[in-house]
Protein backbone atom coordinates (compact mmCIF):
# COMPACT_ATOMS: atom_id res chain seq x y z
CA UNK A 1 0.00 0.00 0.00
CA UNK A 2 1.28 3.45 -0.92
CA UNK A 3 1.87 5.85 1.95
CA UNK A 4 0.52 9.35 1.37
CA UNK A 5 2.13 11.03 4.38
CA UNK A 6 3.90 14.38 4.25
CA UNK A 7 6.95 13.95 6.52
CA UNK A 8 9.66 16.52 7.15
CA UNK A 9 12.04 15.00 4.58
CA UNK A 10 9.62 15.93 1.77
CA UNK A 11 10.01 19.66 2.49
CA UNK A 12 12.64 22.22 1.53
CA UNK A 13 13.63 23.67 4.88
CA UNK A 14 16.73 25.83 4.56
CA UNK A 15 17.58 28.81 2.35
CA UNK A 16 20.31 26.73 0.68
CA UNK A 17 17.68 24.21 -0.49
CA UNK A 18 15.70 27.03 -2.12
CA UNK A 19 18.86 28.57 -3.64
CA UNK A 20 19.72 25.20 -5.19
CA UNK A 21 16.39 25.22 -7.07
CA UNK A 22 16.62 28.88 -8.09
CA UNK A 23 20.06 28.39 -9.72
CA UNK A 24 19.01 26.18 -12.67
CA UNK A 25 15.27 25.54 -12.57
CA UNK A 26 12.90 23.86 -14.97
CA UNK A 27 9.82 26.07 -15.13
CA UNK A 28 6.18 25.19 -15.51
CA UNK A 29 3.60 27.87 -14.96
CA UNK A 30 0.21 29.42 -15.36
CA UNK A 31 -0.63 33.12 -15.07
CA UNK A 32 -1.19 32.65 -11.31
CA UNK A 33 1.31 29.93 -10.28
CA UNK A 34 4.83 28.94 -11.28
CA UNK A 35 6.50 25.73 -10.15
CA UNK A 36 10.27 25.62 -10.41
CA UNK A 37 11.94 22.22 -10.29
CA UNK A 38 15.45 20.87 -10.22
CA UNK A 39 16.58 17.24 -10.11
CA UNK A 40 17.91 15.98 -6.78
CA UNK A 41 19.79 12.83 -5.83
CA UNK A 42 17.60 11.89 -2.86
CA UNK A 43 15.28 9.49 -4.64
CA UNK A 44 12.11 11.37 -3.70
CA UNK A 45 10.57 14.78 -4.46
CA UNK A 46 10.59 17.72 -2.04
CA UNK A 47 8.55 20.92 -2.01
CA UNK A 48 8.99 24.48 -0.81
CA UNK A 49 6.28 27.14 -0.83
CA UNK A 50 6.57 30.89 -1.24
CA UNK A 51 3.34 32.84 -0.92
CA UNK A 52 4.27 36.51 -0.68
CA UNK A 53 2.17 38.98 1.26
CA UNK A 54 2.72 41.31 -1.69
CA UNK A 55 0.59 39.07 -3.92
CA UNK A 56 -1.88 37.61 -1.40
CA UNK A 57 -2.73 40.18 1.26
CA UNK A 58 -4.86 38.22 3.71
CA UNK A 59 -3.34 35.54 5.93
CA UNK A 60 -6.28 33.16 5.59
CA UNK A 61 -5.93 33.27 1.79
CA UNK A 62 -2.17 32.58 2.00
CA UNK A 63 -2.87 29.67 4.35
CA UNK A 64 -5.56 28.27 2.02
CA UNK A 65 -3.19 28.38 -0.96
CA UNK A 66 -0.39 26.69 1.01
CA UNK A 67 -2.75 24.04 2.38
CA UNK A 68 -4.12 23.16 -1.07
CA UNK A 69 -0.62 23.10 -2.58
CA UNK A 70 0.72 20.79 0.14
CA UNK A 71 -2.29 18.50 -0.27
CA UNK A 72 -1.86 18.35 -4.05
CA UNK A 73 1.85 17.53 -3.62
CA UNK A 74 1.09 14.89 -0.97
CA UNK A 75 -1.36 13.10 -3.27
CA UNK A 76 0.96 13.23 -6.32
CA UNK A 77 4.31 12.58 -4.58
CA UNK A 78 4.64 8.99 -5.84
CA UNK A 79 4.07 9.96 -9.46
CA UNK A 80 6.55 12.86 -9.38
CA UNK A 81 10.23 12.62 -10.34
CA UNK A 82 13.02 13.06 -7.77
CA UNK A 83 13.06 16.83 -7.93
CA UNK A 84 13.08 19.75 -5.57
CA UNK A 85 10.08 21.97 -6.32
CA UNK A 86 9.47 25.58 -5.34
CA UNK A 87 5.94 26.88 -5.82
CA UNK A 88 5.71 30.62 -6.49
CA UNK A 89 2.37 32.40 -6.55
CA UNK A 90 1.56 35.55 -8.49
CA UNK A 91 -1.15 38.16 -8.38
CA UNK A 92 -4.61 36.79 -9.00
CA UNK A 93 -4.12 33.43 -7.31
CA UNK A 94 -6.38 34.45 -4.43
CA UNK A 95 -9.30 34.83 -6.88
CA UNK A 96 -9.08 31.14 -7.83
CA UNK A 97 -11.50 28.82 -6.08
CA UNK A 98 -10.25 25.57 -4.53
CA UNK A 99 -11.18 23.38 -7.50
CA UNK A 100 -9.53 25.65 -10.08
CA UNK A 101 -6.37 25.95 -7.99
CA UNK A 102 -6.16 22.18 -7.52
CA UNK A 103 -6.67 21.55 -11.25
CA UNK A 104 -3.96 24.09 -12.12
CA UNK A 105 -1.53 22.38 -9.73
CA UNK A 106 -2.31 18.94 -11.18
CA UNK A 107 -1.63 20.26 -14.68
CA UNK A 108 1.72 21.69 -13.55
CA UNK A 109 2.74 18.43 -11.82
CA UNK A 110 2.00 16.55 -15.06
CA UNK A 111 4.06 19.06 -17.05
CA UNK A 112 7.05 18.63 -14.71
CA UNK A 113 6.69 14.87 -15.02
CA UNK A 114 6.88 15.16 -18.82
CA UNK A 115 9.97 17.40 -18.59
CA UNK A 116 11.86 15.07 -16.25
CA UNK A 117 14.00 12.28 -17.68
CA UNK A 118 13.17 9.71 -14.94
CA UNK A 119 9.39 10.00 -14.73
UniProtKB/Swiss-Prot annotation:
Its EC number is 3.1.26.5. It comes from the Bacteria. GO terms for biological process: tRNA 5'-leader removal. It is an enzyme of class 3 (hydrolase). It catalyses: Endonucleolytic cleavage of RNA, removing 5'-extranucleotides from tRNA precursor. The keyword Cell membrane does not apply. The keyword Iron-sulfur does not apply. GO terms for cellular component: ribonuclease P complex. One of its GO terms (molecular function) is ribonuclease P activity. Keywords: Endonuclease, Hydrolase, Nuclease, RNA-binding, tRNA processing. RNaseP catalyzes the removal of the 5'-leader sequence from pre-tRNA to produce the mature 5'-terminus. It can also cleave other RNA substrates such as 4.5S RNA. The protein component plays an auxiliary but essential role in vivo by binding to the 5'-leader sequence and broadening the substrate specificity of the ribozyme. Belongs to the RnpA family. Consists of a catalytic RNA component (M1 or rnpB) and a protein subunit. This is Ribonuclease P protein component.
